[in-house]
Amino acid sequence: MTSVVVVGTQWGDEGKGKITDFLSADAEVIARYQGGDNAGHTIVIDGKKFKLHLIPSGIFFPQKISVIGNGVVVNPKSLVKELAYLHDEGVTTDNLRISDRAHVILPYHIQLDQLQEDAKGDNKIGTTIKGIGPAYMDKAARVGIRIADLLDKDIFAERLRINLAEKNRLFEKMYDSTPLDFDAIFEEYYAYGQEIKQYVTDTSVILNDALDAGKRVLFEGAQGVMLDIDQGTYPFVTSSNPVAGGVTIGSGVGPSKINKVVGVCKAYTSRVGDGPFPTELFDEVGERIREVGHEYGTTTGRPRRVGWFDSVVMRHSRRVSGITNLSLNSIDVLSGLDTVKICVAYDLDRKRIDYYPASLEQLKRCKPIYEELPGWQEDITGVRSLDELPENARNYVRRVGELVGVRISTFSVGPGREQTNILESVWASI
């Protein structure tokens, strides 16, 4: 029984897809356990970029099983589009499995997402308008439609009719918006269900059988710990649990079967959307990091907010997600800076704190306390070991590990597979 969970430790976009792809080489099953197509991950294979939003990164290994777990909310339209994209690129999807217990995103979820966000005005959350939140709302309210329901024509029609009638009343009475047509949605989405039914199964059985047989299973999280609905910067969060604990709920695998948790972070910090960001940069250094790091959302295309590495955030993520190993990405983006900074604590009302406050009002008053380190000018994109890094870059990597309190297993100096350097094999240490 061998399993590893990959989680983002910041606000998403840390390079989880790249690390999952890297670790997938030694895994036999790769599974997603939460989120939806609001998450974007980019994988570079032989210099070619592949952008996925829903299907696990392991799909590029045809001999390995890729699982969309029950904790994922699935937009069938997006899924069918993504499958077609992969087929056009010559990628087989015969190894994909989708949980029959996963909930379905339908057009009324997306419309409600947009209307709710518009109604918030200046207090908007910064949602991707993918219908994720409303789909999880229906799940919690016990009125959601699952993949198993989507495949049953009569059940789907019955539940869609009830849900749509309720949502249309909401659209018309509360938001003065146009109602949606039952027949159009039913025909389109039932057809999508028929297109994906070959992949649908009880994925909890597949995952547990694999673990019981001694196979290596890799669990892939979406977003990041700081977007977790319980542990993140609420309410500027996603609607699910990206923390490692979300694996057990979102995959149907018990906590006793989780061995390692790899936290993925960048050598700096980025964030899409609104919400607290203590180390955010508004100067030319921030703009340089954004441009060099290509910090634009995979899903939205929006410019990401960027800032210095925040070890307070990272220690919070380590604690609430039980991180055992760290993967440090995008060190190369900091090349060329005379000085690099790491936030080691916050100043809250002239008192030094090293925890991440739950209160948004307190966070607004938090000022980062920085430790400055000398930068490096060298191009490090061709580095293939820690010893090859310039001394200042090497010291930066070591200091990050010390401040977070977790050993660094891999570090990356670019987006390619070959630019990921191993310091310690996660699989071998289990």
From Swiss-Prot:
Substrate binds at T298, T299, T300, G301, R302, P303, R304. One of its GO terms (cellular component) is cytoplasm. The active site is at D13, H41. Keywords: Cytoplasm, GTP-binding, Ligase, Magnesium, Metal-binding, Nucleotide-binding, Purine biosynthesis. PROSITE patterns: ADENYLOSUCCIN_SYN_1 (PS01266), ADENYLOSUCCIN_SYN_2 (PS00513). Binds 1 Mg(2+) ion per subunit. Signal peptide: none annotated. It is found in: Cytoplasm. The keyword DNA repair does not apply. InterPro entries: Adenylosuccin_syn_GTP-bd (IPR018220), Adenylosuccin_syn_Lys_AS (IPR033128), Adenylosuccinate_synth_dom1 (IPR042109), Adenylosuccinate_synth_dom2 (IPR042110), Adenylosuccinate_synth_dom3 (IPR042111), Adenylosuccinate_synthetase (IPR001114), P-loop_NTPase (IPR027417). Gene3D superfamilies: Adenylosuccinate Synthetase, subunit A, domain 1, Adenylosuccinate Synthetase, subunit A, domain 2, Adenylosuccinate Synthetase, subunit A, domain 3. Mg(2+) binds at D13, G40. Its cofactor is Mg(2+). Homodimer. Plays an important role in the de novo pathway of purine nucleotide biosynthesis. Catalyzes the first committed step in the biosynthesis of AMP from IMP. This is Adenylosuccinate synthetase.
